Amino acid sequence: GPALTVSTACSSSAKVFASAERLIRLGLADAALVGGVDTLCGSVLFGFNALQLVSAEPCRPFDAERSGISLGEAAGFALLERDDPADRASIRLVGW
């Protein structure tokens, strides 16, 4: 099946899930492994700093006096499959 990389900033994961759903719905694929990874690099940190979004103080995201943002790295993947009623009894949802 198709293999592609999508880089549309914050919307990348939404785009790959929508694309995978469309391929499955149209019958072009029975399943799709989709995922997203976000890593921090110097240019990202410099960009947020240039926008004055990085606080000089520690970030307190749940504080009424909060400022700045919390940047982090993450990865997530999911297997999307065609819904087949005959297979429902044997499907086991697993995750970490």
What do these predicted regions represent?
Residues P58-W96:
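Condensing-enzyme catalytic core mediating Claisen C-C bond formation in acyl metabolism
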Residues A3-G36, L71-D87:
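Active-site-proximal alpha-helical scaffold in enzymes
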Residues L28-A50, S55-C59, R66, W96:
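Acyl-CoA/ACP chain-elongation machinery
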Residues G1-V6, S55-D63:
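Glycine/charged-rich beta-loop-alpha catalytic/anionic-binding loops adjacent to active sites
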